[in-house]
Amino acid sequence: MTHYHFVGIKGAGMSSLAQIMHDLGHEVQGSDIEKYVFTEVALKNKGIKILPFNADNIKEGMVVIQGNAFPDTHEEIVKAHDLKLDVIRYHDFLGHVIDQYTSVAVTGAHGKTSTTGLLSHVMNGDKKTSFLIGDGTGMGLPASDYFAFEACEYRRHFLSYHPDYAIMTNIDFDHPDYFKDIDDVASAFQSMAHNVKKAIIAWGDDDHLRQLKADVPIYYYGLNKNDDIYADNIQITDKGTQFDVYVNGEYYDQFLSPQYGDHNIQNALAVIAISYLEKMDVNNIKEALETFGGVKRRFNETNVANQVLVDDYAHHPREISATIETARKKYPNKDIVAVFQPHTFSRTQAFLDEFATSLSKADHVYLCEIFGSIRENTGDLTIQDLINRIDGSALIEENNIDVLDQFDNAVILFMGAGDIQKLQRAYEEHVGMTNEF
């Protein structure tokens, strides 16, 4: 048994990885800021100790896992080096972990977490699968056959991984503090393609993914008949979305997903493709798909009188558009109210006009102050720059949360990657209910 200490344990990936090592029988603890982060709930439920940052947390005999947001000058990292302990970056450590399994990486600018969550749930319907999801959820199942994990392209960290399979959901320009342009992003994915050992499953409508070169087969999925794996005869029902799946032009089977929106059908197709290639029992896969309950912070719903409150991680214009589309398809007779907190000044600056366009698809828009990050907490623009671009939009804060009372028979989307949950929590307290995120 190894004693692991995670520096930045409340990070989504770090939280998941800490849970996996705990499940596999190791002693696990970690440190982070004292401010509430939704990932700490799962850690506490497993009895994993969360400490405030302090050099005294580091003891002889530990293996220290260093979160990617924390520099080598961090007091705990300095202490670990002074004690000559093994200090391993998150992505490097995860790369070692996955080598013990048949691994499936899920990567792409958007849809990674939702697809990884679906993949782990569906695969466990047929084969024992450990998993690491970017919503802070992780599970290490002893004697697992498979390992499903989220692989982020930021700073090319995913190049530390050599998975058996890779699902690539899309390529888009994001993380403008690191990537220069879309071609820079595409080059990172091209490099990742050469790391894959068995096959790549890629979205067929993405021009950049269509240009990939790889040493393994690439199977394209989507809603078009020229895709290797495609959905047809799509029907929206009160139980979700039903569709037929074709593989290489031949009918495979009919599936039902409890989710709505084209992007969720595409996620399901990617997962079905993996199960098909690994010759899993299709009936087990169908049953598991029908029982998928979603992942944390991805269209998580709470009902309050005639309102549906939705907690969603959407923080890029395309993700916002997809979340609004899902709300409209699931609740066609309700108004859509967007409450959005931009995440990082560089992303807000880079996509200012795109944010305005995507948010304008909602019936009403409220905006929060820009949320900075550990790496970047100031910028030249303000939230007023975005408000000025969206007709009828307004600033919302905890002290004026009651403006949402006026929207009867509405879906209120609380979107963002920062601490937007505090506004939903404030609104729920205002209307007399409480909910732990």
Curated annotation (Swiss-Prot):
It catalyses: UDP-N-acetyl-alpha-D-muramate + L-alanine + ATP = UDP-N-acetyl-alpha-D-muramoyl-L-alanine + ADP + phosphate + H(+). It is found in: Cytoplasm. Its main location: cytoplasm. GO terms for cellular component: cytoplasm. Belongs to the MurCDEF family. Cell wall formation. NCBIfam families: murC. This is UDP-N-acetylmuramate--L-alanine ligase.
